Structure formats: structure tokens, C-alpha cells
A protein has these predicted regions:
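Non-catalytic, mobile gating and regulatory segments of ester bond hydrolases
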Residues: 1-133
């Protein structure tokens, strides 16, 4: 069964100007939030990087062996970031306004990033605490 990595292999060479953003792109961007970006984007209002730039910085700090030892969700997200960085479709998307807020006192967490596509479209990816357990 195909997954999002297969989709990137299949459609990663097609720009957003040729095929507009779709539901699978949304799924891919939603997964990207699980990459820890704070060391590379410390100021939410001023920091921004392309996916390709973030991948280069992230991979300089995390060896393949280290990535392989990460929990499944984070390992998959790191591998996704690497694949996106090598695709025409995603490499130049700009990541902005990254927030990573954890409160042990309130037992909450929230992270979000705005992804700017080359055509000026914005996508907001976020994750947070679910108190409905």
C-alpha cells in the first residue's frame, strides 16, 4: 500500500504551479510539525527557513544512526523532512512563525508552524494536548 513517502516519490517533481495544493499535501505538512524545529527557528516572529535549509541544519545535528533510534513518530518525521528537502515540490516552501510551547505545570503542549508555498498560499500545521482522554 502506498504512503506519503511514495507520494513524494511520485509527485515530488511537480511544482505547486502545475498541480495545486491538495489533501495529501495537507497530510504531509501536518506530519512535518513533529520535527523539532526550535533549535533552528528560535524566534517565532523573525525566524524562517525553507524546508531544504531546515533539513540541512537538522541532518548536520542528527546522524542517520541517531534518527534510527528515535521513537517511530519522530523518526518518520525526520525521514519525511529529508525526502521533502530533495523534492522540487516541497524544498523551497518556507517555514515561519514556529512555536513550541510545553508546560509541565499545566500538562499541556502546543506546537505550530506556518508553511508558505511558492504561490503565496499558507498552510498552518499544529499539534497539541488532547484533554478528551
Amino acid at each position: 500500500m502506498a504512503d506519503i513517502m511514495d507520494y513524494i516519490d511520485w509527485r515530488g517533481d511537480i511544482g505547486f504551479d502545475e498541480v495545486h495544493v491538495n489533501e495529501v499535501d495537507g497530510l504531509i505538512f501536518s506530519q512535518l510539525i513533529y520535527v523539532q524545529m526550535k533549535p533552528y527557528m528560535p524566534d517565532a516572529k523573525k525566524s524562517y527557513l525553507t524546508i531544504k535549509q531546515l533539513s540541512s541544519l537538522y541532518c548536520a545535528d542528527h546522524s542517520d544512526d541517531e534518527i534510527e533510534q528515535m521513537p517511530n513518530l519522530f523518526r518518520h518525521s525526520a525521514r519525511l523532512l529529508q525526502k521533502l528537502a530533495h523534492s522540487r515540490r516541497y524544498a523551497d516552501c518556507i517555514l515561519r512563525y514556529y512555536i513550541y510551547d510545553i508546560s509541565e505545570k499545566e500538562e499541556s503542549q502546543f506546537s505550530a508552524v506556518t508553511i508558505e508555498l511558492p504561490d503565496g498560499t499558507y498552510f498552518i500545521s499544529y499539534s497539541g494536548t488532547d484533554h478528551d482522554a
